[in-house]
Amino acid sequence: MIDTSAIRGKLTPNRDLSELTWLRVGGPADWLFQPADIDDLQTFLRMLPADIAVFPMGVGSNLIVRDGGLRAVVIRLGRGFNAIDVAGDTVTAGAAALDAHVARKAADAGVDLTFLRTIPGSIGGAVRMNAGCYGSYTADVFRSAQVVLRSGELATLGAAELNFRYRQSDLPEGAVLVSASLQGVPGDPEALHARMQAQLDKRDQTQPTKERSAGSTFRNPAGFSSTGRADDTHELKAWKVIDEAGMRGARLGGAQMSEMHSNFLINTGGATAADLEGLGEEVRKKVYDTSGITLEWEIMRVGDPLDG
């Protein structure tokens, strides 16, 4: 058991995670903790036995939780972690602040973080995964992050400590990112909002935004962002090699590779995590067999299968 006497947040045992992920699949976590604020999170992690695993979870936009669930304490940040403050060209956002909200508030203040507007998820996830699109990455604008380490200690990490790479960073194991400071370049608010609207229009025309998906399924083999630069003509894209392998529209159970954009894995209704991950693995095998390219997952998969 976990001692709850000193915490103010909500601790829920055996919490089903399927309703917390965009794909609406997954089994239960041993525990779900929703801290009230940073002090509460620090208190909880200090008293949590060291042998209990911690999994920080954002809004579940880039995540498959396997059907057997997660043997860990899942930490999900809420309202106490979604403030957005702008000072000059620097935007400091709580880890639970949505990327789209940060982009809009920055634009209101004449700060260009427009690439965040079409990225699903929260700032915590954007930093952890070095999220990006249209040739811009979180690492390009990142200045520092506040994290609560697994020990409960509050620390400030810079870009050197996080060692950003394509869709990766070195956030310490068990650490929970609580806020990040990003520095954009000045811009005209009206022009920034117009650019974001154009990006949204393009996304809606090319991606299955009305389906249950988790964004891009696989990293691009070239290491570029999944949508590429607006003027990028590089041929080696994940969607292209998936198409060449004949896997656009492929199905397994309730899972499907989108007909609209073949690098989007969607839950058409009633899919299990096993369906989704299984179809993804079929795609990886077929792409390797036809092109010799090994696709790497961009969607994070965690937890245990139902039978194990």
From Swiss-Prot:
Ranges for region Disordered: 199-230
Primary localisation category: cytoplasm
EC number(s) reported in the record: 1.3.1.98
Domain FAD-binding PCMH-type: 24-187
Annotated SUPFAM superfamilies: FAD-binding/transporter-associated domain-like, Uridine diphospho-N-Acetylenolpyruvylglucosamine reductase, MurB, C-terminal domain
InterPro entries (alphabetical): FAD-bd_PCMH (IPR016166), FAD-bd_PCMH-like_sf (IPR036318), FAD-bd_PCMH_sub1 (IPR016167), FAD-bd_PCMH_sub2 (IPR016169), MurB (IPR003170), MurB_C (IPR011601), MurB_C_sf (IPR036635), Oxid_FAD_bind_N (IPR006094)
Compositional bias segments (type: Basic and acidic residues): 200-213
Any single biological process term in GO: cell division
Keyword vocabulary terms for this entry: Cell cycle, Cell division, Cell shape, Cell wall biogenesis/degradation, Cytoplasm, FAD, Flavoprotein, NADP, Oxidoreductase, Peptidoglycan synthesis
Protein's UniProt keywords contain NADP: yes
Molecular function in Gene Ontology: FAD binding; UDP-N-acetylmuramate dehydrogenase activity
Cofactor list: FAD
Keyword Cell wall biogenesis/degradation in annotation: yes
Recorded metabolic or biological pathway in which this protein acts: Cell wall biogenesis; peptidoglycan biosynthesis
GO CC annotation terms, alphabetical: cytosol
Entry-linked PROSITE patterns: FAD_PCMH
Cellular compartment(s): Cytoplasm
Reactions this protein catalyses: UDP-N-acetyl-alpha-D-muramate + NADP(+) = UDP-N-acetyl-3-O-(1-carboxyvinyl)-alpha-D-glucosamine + NADPH + H(+)
Polar residues composition-biased segments: 214-228
Active-site residue numbers: R167, S216, E298
Entry similarity comment: Belongs to the MurB family.
Described purpose of this protein according to its UniProt entry: Cell wall formation.
Name under which the protein is recorded: UDP-N-acetylenolpyruvoylglucosamine reductase
Source organism of this protein record: Ruegeria pomeroyi (strain ATCC 700808 / DSM 15171 / DSS-3)
Gene assigned in the entry: murB
